[in-house]
A protein has these predicted regions:
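Class II aminoacyl-tRNA synthetase catalytic cores and aaRS-like
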Residues: 1-342
Length: 345
C-alpha cells in the first residue's frame, strides 16, 4: 500500500503465511516472557500479535517500548500453533515474526487513562483526553457503528427516491422550541447570524422549488438546558420532506427506515416489533399510558374508572371530576388475593 503498511491488520490471515510484510500501528500491550517478547499491535481495524525472541538484535530495544508507542514493523507472517490460535481476531491464526522495526512516535511514560482497558475513568477525564478515549475498543466500535448507520440511512433514502440536499448553517433567527445560538458578523458590525435549530424554512423552499423528496442528516443547534439523555447545544437529526404525500405515506417510509436500520444493527439478543408498528392517537396514548411517549414493553394499561367515583361520596375524587379530571387505575395482572407493592409495577 505504502511505506508504512502493506495491509490493514484485519486483512492479515493464513493466506499470507511465509510472506514478508510491513505494518504500522499502536502498541496495545506487550508481554516479556524472558526468551520471547510478544507485542499486540493495533490499528484502526484489528490487532496482530508480533513476536521476537531474545536471540534477535531487536530484542533489547523492543523490550523498552511502551503502550501507545507508534511503531512500524517489518517481518514474516508465520502460522500459530493450534493451542495459541485466537478465534476472536481476524488475524488470530497467524503472528508476525519481527525482523526490523522503527519507532514513529513515542508515548509519554504515564497515560491519564489506559487505552487497552475498559476501566471507568469518569466523564471529566475521558472528555479532557478525548483523543485517547476514542482509541479504546468500545469507542472505536461506537464511532464505526455511527458511520455505518449513517451510510445505511443514506442508501435507504436514495433507494426511496430522496435527494440529500444541504441547507445553510449561518442564517437568520426563526422561532423554534429553544433559544438561538448567535454568531457575530465581522462585516456587518452589530449584526448576528443565528445557527439553525432545524432546517425548516430552507427545506420548505426546496419543496416549493419542485423537489419531490428531500432528506438531510442535519446539524441542529439549540441553546437550551442540558438533559440527562441529550447533549446540550447541538445534535444531528434525519430531516425529510415529501411532496404530494399523505400521512400514511410518511409513516410508511419512517417505519421501514426504523425497522430496517434496527434490524441490521441490533445486537443478536435483541428483538424488534414486526411491521406495521402499532399507532395511537394522542388521546388514546394519554388515556391508556398517561403520556405521549409510552414504553410498550410494559404490558400495563391505565383503566378509566371515573364513572365509579361519580356520586360515590368521596369528595376528593368528586371535586376533581367536576373540574374535568379523570380517575385512572392500573389493573395488575393475576394479582387477585395477593399483596401488591411498587416493585410489581
Amino acid at each position: 500500500m505504502n511505506v508504512y503498511r502493506d495491509y490493514y491488520l484485519k486483512d492479515i490471515n493464513k493466506e499470507l503465511v511465509d510472506k514478508k510484510i510491513t505494518v504500522s500501528g499502536w502498541i496495545n500491550r506487550s508481554r516479556n516472557h524472558g526468551n520471547l517478547l510478544f507485542i499486540d499491535l493495533r490499528d484502526s481495524t484489528s490487532l496482530l500479535q508480533c513476536v521476537v525472541d531474545n536471540s534477535s538484535v531487536n530484542f533489547n530495544e523492543l523490550s523498552k517500548i511502551k503502550n501507545e508507542d507508534v511503531i512500524k514493523i517489518y517481518g514474516q507472517i508465520t502460522k500459530r500453533s493450534e493451542e495459541t490460535i485466537n478465534s476472536n481476531l481476524e488475524s488470530g491464526e497467524v503472528e508476525l515474526k519481527i525482523e526490523n522495526f522503527e519507532i514513529l512516535s513515542q508515548c509519554s511514560k504515564t497515560l491519564p487513562l489506559e487505552v487497552n482497558s475498559d476501566n471507568d475513568y469518569g466523564e471529566e477525564v475521558r472528555l479532557k483526553y478525548r483523543y485517547l478515549d476514542l482509541r479504546r475498543s468500545k469507542m472505536q466500535h461506537n464511532i464505526k457503528l455511527r458511520n455505518n448507520i449513517i451510510n445505511f440511512v443514506r442508501g435507504f433514502m436514495n433507494n426511496e427516491g430522496f435527494m440529500e440536499l444541504a441547507t445553510p448553517i449561518l442564517t437568520a433567527p426563526s422561532p423554534e422550541g429553544a433559544r438561538d445560538y448567535l454568531v457575530p458578523s465581522r462585516i456587518h458590525k452589530g449584526s448576528f447570524y443565528a445557527l439553525p435549530q432545524a432546517p425548516q424554512q430552507f427545506k420548505q423552499l426546496y419543496m416549493a422549488s419542485g423537489v419531490d423528496k428531500y432528506f438531510q442528516i442535519a446539524p441542529c443547534f439549540r441553546d437550551e438546558d442540558s438533559r440527562a439523555d441529550r447533549s446540550p447545544g447541538e445534535f444531528y437529526q434525519i430531516d425529510m420532506e415529501m411532496s404530494f404525500a399523505t400521512q400514511e405515506d410518511i409513516l410508511d417510509v419512517i417505519s421501514r427506515l426504523l425497522f430496517d436500520t434496527f434490524d441490521k444493527f441490533k445486537s443478536k439478543e435483541k428483538s424488534i416489533n414486526k411491521l406495521p408498528f402499532p399507532t395511537f392517537t394522542y388521546r388514546d396514548s394519554i388515556e391508556n399510558f398517561g403520556c405521549d411517549k409510552p414504553d410498550l414493553r410494559n404490558p400495563l394499561r391505565l383503566k378509566n374508572v371515573t364513572r365509579y367515583f361519580e356520586g360515590s361520596g368521596l369528595q376528593i375524587f368528586e371535586n376533581l371530576i367536576k373540574k374535568g379530571a379523570m380517575v385512572n387505575c392500573i389493573q395488575a395482572v393475576k394479582s387477585e388475593g395477593k399483596p401488591l407493592s411498587l416493585i410489581h409495577i
